[in-house]
Regions:
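Long, contiguous domain-sized segments
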Residues: 2-289, 294-306, 314, 354, ...
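Long, charge-dense tracts
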Residues: 294, 299, 304-570
Length: 1003
């Protein structure tokens, strides 16, 4: 029998009260103010006119050295009262002579040019007269103030690194974690000023599979967070799997590092690297990269910027840092020596037999063990209870969970009829001037390359919409001869609408790779921009011959997957999307069916093409909207608006930069019909326009000037941040004004929007108020409700599990969860089921030791789950920031309505975001390339799970954030790579890193 879960627990801790206090003792070092002007003068010496000057001292390289050679030191973001901390009981990791030598070498590394040696000598002499002094300081680790208007905990800046580190040290003091097959021995990993919280990593564990052994560790991250309107801060614990790269290429004899990616290396020296420094119990860190050597004009693999040892030239190290080639050539030997060196695996390095993630029950047991380290001043965060606002947490029009075999044809016909009704309504919205006596016409295009996909495309459209007949009989020669303006046209007549499909073979070289230098040759941003521009122009000219109607249309395009092109840069997908949009068509891509080694897209061709039609038609506004089950608990006629900010920095890895706010408005029509009007905000016309028209309009924002491609992105973006914020809030003012007159619930994604709409930050928000411009915060307009959604990105929501009432394995129930405490809450949590592909992932799965099978034909046999992905649905926080309780609004009911918006009836799986936010976010596909950036490595990834494998997960319009998929949070993209090319020994100035507490540190 299925377990009925009443409660869930989160892997989080909080103080027992606002008065709880813990004071820790440290030795701390201030960054000497007397040094600032001299070092800045050195850094800005000879900078070209117009270049962004340094306003804060670039200590990044110095901090890199500390992570490698003095890992016990905690580095805080500057400016802060103190820069470096070490617990009082830890031996001095940087004795005076060592520190002085490091500073001298660091200054020389900042400006190594011979012409600046005299100036460098003067700066060294000036700094030597005011050496930094270690101070004994006390630091409050728990108690913190609250925000004036919102009553939200506002931790001090030092608490974000120091408090998690204190808890991590307490967990280490517990000793090893005992499990059925052995013990886990954890060590701490150093954290820099951009890292969040503390991290513990276990010893490497072997996993024999086939003819080789794969290696992995268990990792624990502890981070400090806040929750809106809660005066108590929270500590989140995230347990996961870290995999080690040991596969050596048969061609090079080394581990493969993808170009333009950095790999983290964890180090454990046998003796201290620095003479006179103590041996730390912590691991050390350094980073490798594969980069283009401009002098040699070839790709090379080495430590980033020469590695931390390069800054110490002239200092005799007690043990030399291993060479990059040594580790890359014999990675397993270095692991087997007690993790003397381990390369953190990333998905770009190829496959790995150990799969990421831990399942719910094992997480709960690891958390239970860690809770033994809790001091009296902390407690586990209380359990959450399921909502009682509705009998079911599903929408009223949710499809049945299971359908009998004999009833499947009837259910399929019902759903097809829903889609046809939605299509008729969406098309009528696109053509408001059409004759109302004439049936609306849905016209789409199938741009095919292979006969197999063309035939599947036709048959799946027929099945998807429940069409009758074949639409017309044509020969293969007619299909081959079809061209833009003279296509093969298939047509079906239905009671609701006419469906017309124009089939055209993709020709003119549009499906080929972009015209770029070959693999192994450097490709500049200007060359790529020019190639994209050319293909975009050709695509527009080609398809425009077939489009005469001004209304947006849909094109399903058959194209090779990215891996089939020479490099990812050669993939023409983004250029085709832009060009076809210029011609008036929104696009959905389907990969060419083929079998290539382990890759086989032939076996699921029908399913993939069906999903392509599904996703493409949704872009036209054809969808079934979830109908809430709350009756009069929410306002009648409630609309749903959502904002999404497309913002991307131009970096070495991302060649496009963009900033544009997007708003979507979903207006349900007849209650229970599932039909809704979907519109987007046009800031130029200051009005709402059909959603597909918005998508087409967004492509203009993807224009990249070839002349500016190499020099127009990064510096100007950072200088314009304040202007972008002003523009965002002015845009918000106009958009929000248009929502008056009808009850509307406005949704925003916290991690996405708060950097530009700062009111969404925990440190600024106040209940039932809003600020969207220069004016002071004001009460919400009577028609507006404001809800902020937050996901597991940056570990901002905790890991979780259901509390099994039978004291059996803890599972993963889906529902809306509310705090147990009395009173009216404002913050709720949403969970959804695992996708169908992972229903067999056992909740009691064990990655460390064999366990008995619980069910199936092999029940009772032992198995181990190290090679099984640990898929867990993410925990979504729903914070009702603003409503009108005095007028009858119930925050819990509003939150349940948002929870139900994650479950559209026409999607195969639940969404990670509510539907309106999902639609707003998908607009970024028309502004930026949609390729999910590869994870650098699992040391910089910050979420629970591994990236979705496209060969496992069905096609579908995934959630807009590449870190999220349907109902799941996957292994996260790392933080934006701010490491830029070095000019004269200096990295470019880096921007501030926003976070959720109302304060933005200067870097």
């Amino acid at each position: 029998m299925p377990v009925s879960y009443e409660f869930i627990r989160t892997a989080s801790w909080q103080p027992v009260s606002q008065d709880a206090t813990v004071v820790a003792h440290y030795r701390a070092l201030r960054f000497p103010e007397a040094w600032r002007e001299a070092i800045l003068a050195l850094c800005n010496l000879g900078r070209p006119d117009g270049a962004e000057p340094y306003r804060t001292v670039p200590t990044y390289r110095f901090e890199q050295v500390i992570q490698a050679f003095a890992p016990d030191l905690l580095v805080l973001p500057r400016p802060s009262e103190h820069w470096l901390y070490v617990p009082e009981e830890v031996a001095d990791p940087l004795p005076g002579p060592v520190l002085r030598s490091l500073v001298d070498r660091w200054l020389g590394d900042l400006r190594p040019e011979p012409e600046h040696r005299a100036f460098l000598k003067d700066v060294r002499a000036e700094l030597s007269t005011s050496p930094p002094v270690w101070e004994r300081v006390e630091a409050e680790l728990l108690r913190c103030p609250t925000t004036l208007g919102g009553g939200t905990a506002a931790p001090f800046e030092h608490q974000f690194p120091l408090s998690p580190d204190w808890l991590a040290r307490r967990v280490l003091a517990l000793g090893p974690y005992e499990h059925a097959a052995g013990r886990l021995h954890f060590r701490a990993v150093p954290r820099g000023p951009r890292d969040k919280g503390a991290e513990l990593v276990s010893q490497p564990l072997p996993f024999p599979s086939g003819t080789r052994t794969w290696w992995y560790s268990v990792v624990l991250n502890i981070t400090l967070h806040t929750v809106p309107f809660d005066p108590l801060p929270r500590f989140h614990l995230h347990f996961g799997i870290r995999r080690w790269a040991t596969r050596v290429s048969s061609t090079t004899g080394k581990v493969r590092l993808p170009y333009r990616r950095k790999a983290t290396v964890v180090l454990r020296p046998r003796v201290p690297y620095l003479p006179g420094a103590p041996l730390s119990e912590r691991y050390a860190l350094a980073r490798m990269e594969r980069r283009w050597d401009r002098e040699k004009e070839e790709w090379t693999t080495d430590w980033v910027n020469g590695g931390p040892a390069s800054i110490l030239r002239g200092i005799s190290l007690a043990e030399t840092l291993p060479g990059a080639d040594e580790i890359l050539s014999s990675p397993e030997e270095w692991l087997e020596q007690g993790l003397r060196a381990g390369i953190v695996y990333s998905t770009a390095m190829g496959g790995h037999e150990v799969k990421a993630g831990l399942m719910s029950h094992q997480r709960s047991k690891l958390t239970e063990w860690a809770e033994q380290a809790l001091p009296a001043e902390l407690r586990a965060t209380p359990a959450l209870v399921r909502t009682r606002r509705s009998k079911s947490s599903k929408p009223l029009n949710a499809p049945p969970a299971s359908v009998k075999k004999e009833d499947k044809p009837e259910e399929s016909a019902r759903r097809a009829a829903e889609r046809r009704a939605g299509a008729a309504y969406a098309v009528s919205c696109l053509t408001p001037d059409a004759d109302p006596e004439t049936l609306p016409t849905l016209e789409a295009r199938l741009l095919w390359q292979t006969r197999e996909l063309r035939e599947a495309g036709v048959s799946q459209l027929v099945e998807h919409l429940g069409l009758k007949g074949d639409g017309g009989a044509f020969t293969e020669a007619q299909y081959e001869a079809a061209r833009p303006g003279d296509p093969v046209v298939l047509e079906w007549q239905c009671a609701e609408l006419t469906v017309r499909l124009r089939c055209i073979k993709l020709t003119a070289g549009l499906g080929e790779g972009l015209s770029l230098p070959p693999k192994g040759t450097r490709r500049t941003s200007s060359a790529i921009s020019a190639a994209v521009h050319d293909r975009r122009t050709n695509a527009r000219s080609w398809l425009a011959q077939d489009i005469t109607d001004k209304a947006p249309t849909l094109a399903v395009v058959e194209l090779d997957r990215r891996a089939d092109f020479e490099t990812g840069d050669h993939d023409p997908k983004f250029a085709l999307r832009l060009g076809f949009a210029d011609a008036g068509a929104i696009t959905q891509f389907a990969t060419v069916p083929k079998k290539d080694g382990r890759y086989d897209s032939l076996k699921n061709l029908d399913h993939r093409v069906s999903m392509a039609w599904d996703d493409g038609l949704r872009q036209l506004g054809i969808r079934v909207h979830p109908t809430h089950s709350l009756g009069d608990k929410i306002p009648a006629g409630l609309r749903y608006a959502a904002v999404w900010l497309v913002r991307k920095n131009r970096t070495a890895r991302n060649r496009w930069a963009a900033y544009v706010p997007i708003a979507v408005l979903v207006t349900p029509q007849d209650f229970g019909s599932g039909i809704a009007r979907v519109q987007g905000w046009d800031p130029e016309a200051n009005k709402w326009i059909p959603y597909p028209a918005l998508l087409l309009k967004l492509t203009r924002l993807a224009e990249v000037s070839v002349a500016d491609a190499d020099n127009g992105g990064r510096g100007s973006y950072y200088r314009d941040m304040n202007e972008q914020r002003r523009n965002t809030e002015e845009w918000l003012q106009k958009m929000l004004r248009s929502l008056r007159g009808t009850p509307t619930l406005l949704l925003a994604h916290g991690q996405n929007a708060r950097s530009h709409w700062t009111w969404l930050q925990d440190g600024r928000v106040e209940a039932d108020r809003i600020r969207d411009g220069h004016a002071l915060a004001r009460r919400l307009h009577p028609d507006l409700r404001l809800v902020r959604v937050r996901t597991g990105r940056d570990r901002e929501t905790a890991q979780w599990w259901g509390l099994n009432p039978k004291e059996e394995a803890n599972g993963l129930p889906s529902h809306l969860w509310v705090p147990e405490s009395g009173g009216v809450s404002r913050v709720f949590y949403s969970t959804t089921p695992k996708p169908a592909q992972f229903k067999t992932s056992a909740i009691e799965a064990d990655k460390l030791a064999p366990r008995p099978r619980r069910a199936g034909e092999r029940k009772g046999e032992t198995t181990i789950d190290t090679n099984i992905p640990g898929w867990n649905p993410g925990l979504v926080e729903i914070a009702v920031l603003g409503c009108h309780k005095n007028d009858g609004d119930d925050p819990e009911s509003l939150a349940l309505a948002v929870h139900q918006l994650r479950q559209p009836p026409d999607y195969p799986q639940a969404l990670a975001l509510p539907l309106p936010l999902h639609l707003a976010g998908l607009g970024q596909e028309y502004v930026l390339p949609t390729l999910a950036e590869e994870v650098e490595d699992e040391a910089t990834a910050v979420a629970d799970l591994h990236s979705i494998d496209a060969s496992v997960v069905s096609a579908g319009d995934g959630d807009p954030d590449p870190a999220m998929a349907a109902g799941l949070f996957t292994e996260q993209d790392p933080e934006e790579d701010h490491e830029s090319t070095r000019v004269d020994g200096l990295p470019e100035p880096t921007p501030p890193m926003p976070h959720d507490y109302g304060r933005i540190p200067n870097r």
